[in-house]
Amino acid sequence: MADKLRTPPSTESANGRHPSEPEKQWTDTTLSNALANSPERPIGAPTGTNLDEHGQARYTTISGRPVRRLYTPADLPPDWNYDQYLGYPGQPPYTRGIHATGYRGKLWTMRQFSGFASPEETNQRYKELLAHGAGGLSVAFDLPTLMGYDSDHPFSEGEVGKCGVAIDSLEDMEILFDGIRLQDITTSMTINSPASILWAMYLVVAEKQGADWKKISGTLQNDVLKEYLAQKEYIYPPAPSMRLVIDTFEFGSKFTPRFNTISISGYHIREAGSTALQELAFTIYDGIEYVEWALRRGLDIDEFGPRLSFFFNAHNDFFEEIAKYRAARKIWYRLMRDRFHAKQERTRLMRFHTQTAGVSLTAQQPLNNIARVAIQALAAVLGGTQSLHTDSYDEALALPTAEAARISLRTQQIIAYESGVANTIDPLGGSYFVERATLDMEDGAFDYFEKLDTLGGMVNAIEKGFPQKEIAEASYQYQRAVEAREKVIVGVNEFTVDEEPPHILYIDESIREKQSAKLSLLRAQRSNDEVRRTLDALKRAAAQEPRVKPDGSISDANTMPYIIEAVRAYATVGEICEALREVYGAYEETSVA
């Protein structure tokens, strides 16, 4: 199947080049003379450690893909033509973007990921970001919330409010968005295993504000597959986790048509050490898996498909990243059209958010990270992202200070309003280097798709450890190259200095006690009988097999309505997750040999 969906004909390797006579003459004369007089600079530090078997410098991308000295028409397929391989923005195959006017019509959304300590403190940060021009909000939750534990659970000790905001109940969500009209903004929530619970809280807060669910918009990350692949913040086994995701697809297509019910995330796969190609391939194949599970439920692809969104990383290798984004749109279009037979054009569009690479930030000389983030953000923009988060320079050390967060937002604004890159669409389109890299990304992704198809899909591949092994090997090879100084990390393995530790944000250790006291008061004041009733109803629904009804209405076993009722009764995140654990059990990863 995968091979049939490639761009015809399958792209040629660099070994199949047929240079023109002028290129041959240039190689034999101008280039040859230049190399004789001045050899190319070595790669690596300090005198060149990245050499091939002939002692020549080996130029590669960060992912290790070879980079030629020069790209010409000879690096493209012999039948390469503009209409077949590129097309126009806003038209298939969307290589050049999904909007006909690019950023001239609308700039990307500047969506800064933020959340720390208490809901009260994060609420103030959100108001600051909105006041400084942020176009949307992106919620970072703390580790206990991500893992489905309340702040007063023993497992939560030492982690409450550390890497995001602590949300235990609807009361916390009400505080988080106090004074912020949810119908007037878009919100992205980075939450996965407990995603349906936090989304239910968001919907109830919107309801209490008088908002129409059909008019609110935002994005729920809700990508459990990448938890097994990379981030490891899973709760339930894969099958019931997938069932919960499809419940949100079904519910969202009926009641929240403007809300993206998933953000299929390559970001964390890249942060775990994958190459750019692996990020692209595994992310899109995760999307394939979600679509297939939804279709088996009986959902209509043209109902839930338009609400599928993606989330990619922006790493340091400028052109490799741009090629990745361009290839992603092209691949998704072809898959939705030819593999899943989506009829509506909007179902075939890939919309994606991008975040600059947290893993690239260095604790040493942290101000250097401002430059790294700017380069990464520019790549995301030139690749056509719909929204963007720029990391703060101090995030290798702690959650960002208010000043660092403001600089990261200003970085986007300078790119948008001062650089001129938003004035024309896909300005790197037609570059022989970029087009060759885009084709290579596409071809490499389909190679991975064939392997994953053979393994029986992503869930089966995860259980067999295939993608985990691929990521682990790529991570090892990258770290080996850094330690061998084949790859230079400025300020880490080259150009180092002694420096004073910077000012960083510290989280008040009393946050756990405050959240625990709030929980005690909540449990004393709510109707605990109502909490028990709603949780029992949820467990009964979770134990049933959901199927779409003949009239198209949602299944009686869809868990979302039951979770919403539990949230309205002020059941906590931990209580709802524990109810589902009683039905589904907890997942324990086996070691991958």
List where the protein language model places each region:
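Flexible, glycine-rich loop/tail regions that form catalytic "lids" or insertion modules at the edges
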Residues: 4, 18, 22, 28, ...
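Short alpha-helical interface elements
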Residues: 154, 198-205, 227-231, 245, ...
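Generic, well-ordered alpha-helical scaffold segments in large soluble proteins
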Residues: 116, 125-132, 170-180, 201-205, ...
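Flexible glycine/proline-rich, aromatic-decorated loop/lid segments
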Residues: 259, 300-304, 342-356, 364-393, ...
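Short acidic (Asp/Glu) and glycine-rich catalytic loops that position anionic groups and cofactors
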Residues: 106, 152-155, 183, 225-227, ...
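Short beta-alpha connecting loops at secondary-structure transitions
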Residues: 158-162, 187, 226-236, 269-275, ...
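Conserved active-site and cofactor/substrate-binding residues in soluble primary-metabolism enzymes
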Residues: 89, 117-124, 167-171, 193-200, ...
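Catalytic alpha/beta active-site cores
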Residues: 2-315, 320-321, 339-342, 346-353, ...
